[in-house]
From Swiss-Prot:
Catalyzes the oxidation of either pyridoxine 5'-phosphate (PNP) or pyridoxamine 5'-phosphate (PMP) into pyridoxal 5'-phosphate (PLP). It catalyses: pyridoxamine 5'-phosphate + O2 + H2O = pyridoxal 5'-phosphate + H2O2 + NH4(+); pyridoxine 5'-phosphate + O2 = pyridoxal 5'-phosphate + H2O2. InterPro entries: Pyridox_Oxase, Pyridox_Oxase_CS, Pyridox_Oxase_N, Pyridoxamine_oxidase_dimer_C, Split_barrel_FMN-bd. Substrate binds at residues 64, 121, 125, 189-191. This is Pyridoxine/pyridoxamine 5'-phosphate oxidase. Its cofactor is FMN.
Length: 212
């Protein structure tokens, strides 16, 4: 590794964010570190949506991919988050890596992934998880755990042999960010914060330091 590369890596990992030219570069570095240090699910993120009354809802989901177009997760379309994203396709995300004392906040617009993308990801899931996606009516009232187990057994019998197709009501979303903020803990609450902004995906990012 060259001296320049070592210096840039040090800047990215030390909280000196001047080396980062776009948020995806810095996010990739932080996620790689979280993958090494977090005991569970470094790709876990809080997803915030709003209902028809403007009241917020937030829950933890797993990021299943990201690139320059945004951050991807999957769920049932008829779930509470799915209904809220259909009615108001805007959302916020929060990654918090306690072991690194860092967090990343993201806001942006939401679009469904393509059927081909959803099919490809669903095919990678364990078969029991695929069966669960068919058996669950996510966010709907459930009579009992036994009723759910019966539904799982029924689906498992149907797909005892062969591949399990993706349920028509199960898919994914991509959050295309317009704002990404990185926060790094410092002693005495003198934290580091840097914010990236853009109005549209076609525009370049602007970078601003923020007071803690």
């Amino acid at each position: 590794m060259s001296d320049t590369s070592i210096k840039q890596q040090s800047q990215l990992t030390s909280g000196d964010f001047t080396a980062a030219e776009n948020p995806f570069e810095l996010f990739a570095e932080w996620l790689a570190e979280a993958d090494r240090s977090e005991p569970n699910d470094p790709n876990a993120m809080a997803l915030a949506t709003v209902d028809s009354d403007g009241l917020p809802d937030v829950r933890m989901v797993l990021m299943k991919g990201y690139d320059a177009d945004g951050f991807v997760f999957y769920s049932h379309i008829a779930s509470q988050k799915g209904r809220e994203l259909t009615a108001n396709p805007k959302a916020a995300l929060l990654f918090h890596w306690k072991s690194l004392r860092r967090q990343v906040r993201i806001r942006g617009t939401v679009t469904p992934v393509s059927d081909a993308e959803a099919d490809a990801y669903f095919a990678t899931r364990p078969k029991q998880a695929q069966i669960g996606a068919w058996a669950s009516k996510q966010s709907q009232p459930l009579e009992s755990r036994f009723a759910f187990e019966q539904a799982i057994a029924k689906v498992a019998a149907r797909y005892l042999i062969g591949e399990v197709p993706r349920p028509p009501g199960w898919s994914g979303w991509r959050i295309t960010p317009s704002r990404v903020e990185f926060w790094h803990d410092r002693p005495f609450r003198l934290h580091d914060r840097i914010e990236f902004n853009r109005d549209t995906p076609a525009q370049p990012w602007t970078k601003t330091r923020l007071y803690p």
